[in-house]
Amino acid sequence: MVQRLTYRRRLSYNTASNKTRLSRTPGNRIVYLYTKKVGKAPKSACGVLPGRLRGVVAVRPKVLMRLSKTKKHVQQGLWWLHVRQVCPDRIKRAFLIEEQKIVVKVLKAQAQSQKAK
């Protein structure tokens, strides 16, 4: 016969805070083990590259208190790995904008030289 399972806590609904998994005890019984909620790393604030920050531990807020500062912050080297995907586009865009400014100046100079003649 199949063993029946009951929750170990008072909350009897399948909510986000009451998630469980099955576990077999040394006495060969199957019981519920309550799982922790999954943590997420902080989002990128740069606005250009979406997604979560790499190099920051993805844990729940209460666990962050116990972590050392190096695990909660991105070092400069890791930040560059995050941004380097965006930088070539920024460099190209800046170069093209400067080229466009030069073209406008040349066209203005040509127009003035045409008027002078």
Curated annotation (Swiss-Prot):
<dbReference type="Pfam" id="PF01199">
    <property type="entry name" value="Ribosomal_L34e"/>
</dbReference>
<dbReference type="GO" id="GO:0022626">
    <property type="term" value="C:cytosolic ribosome"/>
</dbReference>
<dbReference type="InterPro" id="IPR038562">
    <property type="entry name" value="Ribosomal_eL34_C_sf"/>
</dbReference>
<dbReference type="InterPro" id="IPR008195">
    <property type="entry name" value="Ribosomal_eL34"/>
</dbReference>
<keyword id="KW-0687">Ribonucleoprotein</keyword>
<dbReference type="GO" id="GO:0003735">
    <property type="term" value="F:structural constituent of ribosome"/>
</dbReference>
<feature type="cross-link" description="Glycyl lysine isopeptide (Lys-Gly) (interchain with G-Cter in SUMO2)">
    <location>
        <position position="108"/>
    </location>
</feature>
<comment type="similarity">
    <text>Belongs to the eukaryotic ribosomal protein eL34 family.</text>
</comment>
<keyword id="KW-0007">Acetylation</keyword>
<keyword id="KW-1017">Isopeptide bond</keyword>
<feature type="modified residue" description="N6-acetyllysine">
    <location>
        <position position="36"/>
    </location>
</feature>
<keyword id="KW-0597">Phosphoprotein</keyword>
<protein>
    <recommendedName>
        <fullName>Large ribosomal subunit protein eL34</fullName>
    </recommendedName>
</protein>
<keyword id="KW-0832">Ubl conjugation</keyword>
<feature type="modified residue" description="N6-acetyllysine">
    <location>
        <position position="43"/>
    </location>
</feature>
<dbReference type="GO" id="GO:0005783">
    <property type="term" value="C:endoplasmic reticulum"/>
</dbReference>
<dbReference type="GO" id="GO:0022625">
    <property type="term" value="C:cytosolic large ribosomal subunit"/>
</dbReference>
<comment type="subunit">
    <text>Component of the large ribosomal subunit.</text>
</comment>
<feature type="modified residue" description="Phosphoserine">
    <location>
        <position position="12"/>
    </location>
</feature>
<dbReference type="InterPro" id="IPR018065">
    <property type="entry name" value="Ribosomal_eL34_CS"/>
</dbReference>
<keyword id="KW-0963">Cytoplasm</keyword>
<dbReference type="GO" id="GO:0005737">
    <property type="term" value="C:cytoplasm"/>
</dbReference>
<keyword id="KW-0689">Ribosomal protein</keyword>
<keyword id="KW-0256">Endoplasmic reticulum</keyword>
<dbReference type="GO" id="GO:0045202">
    <property type="term" value="C:synapse"/>
</dbReference>
<dbReference type="GO" id="GO:0006412">
    <property type="term" value="P:translation"/>
</dbReference>
<comment type="function">
    <text>Component of the large ribosomal subunit. The ribosome is a large ribonucleoprotein complex responsible for the synthesis of proteins in the cell.</text>
</comment>
